[in-house]
Amino acid sequence: DSIYAEYYVVPTFDSSLLPDGFVVENYNFNGNEVQSAYLAAGDIRLLFSESAEGTNAGLRIYYEDDNDMMDFVPFLGYSGYVFPVRYQAQIPVPTNYTGSYMPFDKKVVACYIYTELTNNPLSVQAGMENKDTLQPGESTADADPVSVDSLDEMPEFYLFYGMNNNGEENFYLYDWKEGTYQRYVERDTSYDLD
């Protein structure tokens, strides 16, 4: 079950909460007409929901294919913004990263942390796993998330799969200390420089 199973979609919301690029439109959610926000560039729909107690209200990304939601957490940058989206396995999780959650403003942000911080063996590079025990598209990064509260030191960097305001998806590295992000580029440093 989703952690949002006991959340309720609110029929209207304040459109000033939306970043540039999203447009407000009516949407039929489970037979009810509600306001939604839609980013055509990325085919992303936001709904405003809250808990049964009327708390923890906010915009959430709605995935119609499995009737699930995830917190909408935009990270603002110099020329736009990025926000975490559901990980699609077309792009392998970078080597040496382990699944976790970023504690961000009472929101749930699925992310990855550098495996060395977890005191666990290094994860296998995506695509090099034992094919007999893993399902197609599955990697060691798909294991149960590591709680950052259980670590000896809090991570300073979190890797997340996200989308920018132009609808482009990629991995992004969030610097917890500086409050900044950048597109993640994995570099091959295994060769010697002469």
Where is each model-derived feature located?
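Soluble mature domains adjacent to a membrane tether on cell-surface and organelle-surface proteins
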Residues: 1-193
